[in-house]
């Protein structure tokens, strides 16, 4: 049980790190793809809501 719990915990951190790290890296590099796409989506969603 302890090993399984530890494995799940590590997997969660790793998955979160990969997803978050990728976005931060891309956005920091100048929004090559992820950052740029996110900004465009947010900008397009705001006017649609209004």
UniProtKB/Swiss-Prot annotation:
<dbReference type="InterPro" id="IPR024415">
    <property type="entry name" value="Fungus-induced"/>
</dbReference>
<protein>
    <recommendedName>
        <fullName>Fungus-induced-related protein 15</fullName>
    </recommendedName>
</protein>
<feature type="signal peptide">
    <location>
        <begin position="1"/>
        <end position="21"/>
    </location>
</feature>
<keyword id="KW-0732">Signal</keyword>
<comment type="function">
    <text>May have role in hypoxia response.</text>
</comment>
<dbReference type="GO" id="GO:0001666">
    <property type="term" value="P:response to hypoxia"/>
</dbReference>
<dbReference type="Pfam" id="PF10917">
    <property type="entry name" value="Fungus-induced"/>
</dbReference>
<dbReference type="InterPro" id="IPR052889">
    <property type="entry name" value="Celegans_Fungus-Induced_Rsp"/>
</dbReference>
């Amino acid at each position: 049980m302890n090993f399984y719990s530890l494995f799940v915990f590590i997997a969660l951190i790793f998955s979160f790190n990969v997803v978050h790290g990728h976005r931060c890296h891309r956005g920091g590099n100048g929004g090559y793809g992820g950052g740029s796409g996110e900004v465009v989506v947010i900008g397009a969603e705001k006017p649609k809501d209004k």
